[in-house]
Regions:
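Compositionally biased low-complexity segments at domain edges in trafficked proteins
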Residues: 95-116
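Short beta-strand edge segments in extracellular beta-sheet folds
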Residues: 91-93
Length: 116
């Protein structure tokens, strides 16, 4: 089944990004629509795919990871974090494939890629 999934690894503490809020948006032309809002589980993953099946369509998407709130809870970073919301915009061109968007994050940096 085709679907979109994500996974967050906190490379600052060496643990999954437990409790991070993630919002998913879909762009129809220039109109941005929120598809879902989830909280990552103990493994830093959503309990369900972010989107799947007939709701999974070609186009431009955006994931917003609320990492500033997460790091404020687990570290002594300043009140104004260096990274607050990490926004990843990406395209889905083949709805027959599984798309996985992992995020490796610290209070000062992040990296992403198309996973499997």
């Amino acid at each position: 089944m085709t679907k979109l999934t994500t996974h967050v690894l906190d490379i600052y503490s060496g643990r999954p990004g437990k409790g991070i809020k993630v919002d998913l948006y879909y762009y129809n032309n220039d109109k941005k629509t929120k598809i879902s809002s989830i909280i990552l589980n103990n493994d830093g993953r959503p309990d369900q795919p972010l989107i799947e099946g007939t709701n999974f369509k070609e186009g431009k998407y955006e994931l917003v990871f609320f990492v500033g709130d997460y790091f404020k809870k687990i570290t002594d970073i300043p009140k104004v974090p260096f990274l607050d919301d990490v926004i990843i915009k990406f395209g889905i061109s083949n709805v027959e494939e599984h798309y996985h968007v992992p995020l490796l994050v610290s209070p000062w940096s992040y990296s992403t890629y198309r996973g499997s």
